[in-house]
Each structure stands twice: as C-alpha cells, then as structure tokens.
Amino acid sequence: MKTVLITGANGNLGSAVTKEFLDKGYRVVATVIAETMKADFAANPNLDVQVVDLGNETATAAFILSLIEKYKTIDAALLLVGGFAIGNLSSTTGTDIQKQIALNFETAYHVTQPLFQHMMENKNGRIVFIGTRPALEASQGKNLIAYGLSKSLLFKLAEYLNEEARGKNITATVVAPSTLDTPLNRKSMPDTDPAIWVKPAALAEILEFIVSDKNAPIRESVIKVYNNV
C-alpha cells in the first residue's frame, strides 16, 4: 500500500482529494492546523490525521521525520495548504506579499525540503503543488499581485526539484486550476455559471493520476486545469 501525505486535507479541495485517495486504496496521512478539525473526517483504518503547523519549519521537519520513521516510505505528497488575497499593484504592500508567501510557498517548502531528501534516497517519489492561473498569466493576476507572486515560486521550485532528481523516478508537478467550484466562490460570484469552473472531485482524480504508476512516463512539470473558464 502506498502512503501519501495530503496537507490542508480538510479544505474544499483537500476533502475531495483525501476521499479520492482513500477510495483508490492509498494510506493517507492528512494534516490539519487544529485538533478540533480532526472531527471533519470519518474514521478510516487507512487515514492518519495529524495536527501540524506547516508554517513552523522546525516543527514541520520533525513531523516529516516522524512519518518516515513510522511508515518507512512516503511515496507522494500533495501540498494543498494555501490562501487567497485580492489586490492590484497600488494596493499591495510588501507585508501583503510576505503573508501570501508564508501561506502559499513556505508551507509547501517546509514539507518539501526534508521529504525530497527522503525521496532522493529512495530514488522514487511524487510531489504535487497547487499553483494558479494568475501566476502564469498576467491578465489573470494583475489584481491578485501578492497571491500570484507567492504561487509563482512553486513553479520555479518544481523546476529545481526536477532538475536535481533527473534520472530518478521522482517528479515535482504544479497543477494550476482556474476557479474551483466551492460554496465560497458560488457565494462571491453569484452571476457566474459554476459549470465552467473546476469541480474539486474532478481535480482530485487528476491529482491521483499524477501520483499513480500510470503517470510514470510523463515528465510534465505544469498541468493546467482550466475547464471552460
């Protein structure tokens, strides 16, 4: 049985991804930020819910080492923790950018740095980041400056990881969705047809494919999932 780490597992996307991987027979280690969030998950013998502050580099490194000791091999990580901020250049401060980098990049990097070394030793592993269309297209990101800049770092990190892992069965992939069909997005954009958005369950299936053996021959570091947006 493969063991996967899913961060931000109780969010709209995280819940769908956790369900998809459990349904496909994986052992899932799911992270949340508070003890009370454990109640969001139904009991499952293949689910291990852990509370960890991924913004704390020392605590995250210790957490990853404890997982390796417990499960011996971590086959994949899906790093879903993140957050959104609106603001164009004139309204975005350096502090705004730093906050978004801490949330969208550092939480992923703190996991990746120790976990990638484990995967390099095993010559096998998958790391999946969640990017965003505004980080790839200026027309989409001009009013999301801090958010787009913070997410753009994930694309470069994936490039570095893939270069270092060249010749090994290790890949880093950034999946860049457009708007997700979530209750919050439906409420904030009531005049938009949600049929054009990306369903979390559909994105979860794509993430499972990326991690699975079916994806072994593919070396594509960026996958765009825009639906009809």
Show where each model-derived region lies.
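Active-site loop of short-chain dehydrogenase/reductase
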Residues: 73-74, 119-132, 167-171, 221
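C-terminal helical subdomain
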Residues: 167-170, 174-175, 182, 191-229
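Substrate-binding pocket helix/loop in short-chain dehydrogenase/reductase
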Residues: 88-90, 96-101
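Conserved NAD(P)H cofactor-binding loop of Rossmann-fold oxidoreductase domains
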Residues: 78-87
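N-terminal Rossmann NAD(P)H-binding glycine-rich loop of SDR-like oxidoreductase domains
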Residues: 10, 14-18
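Rossmann-fold cofactor-recognition segment
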Residues: 43-58
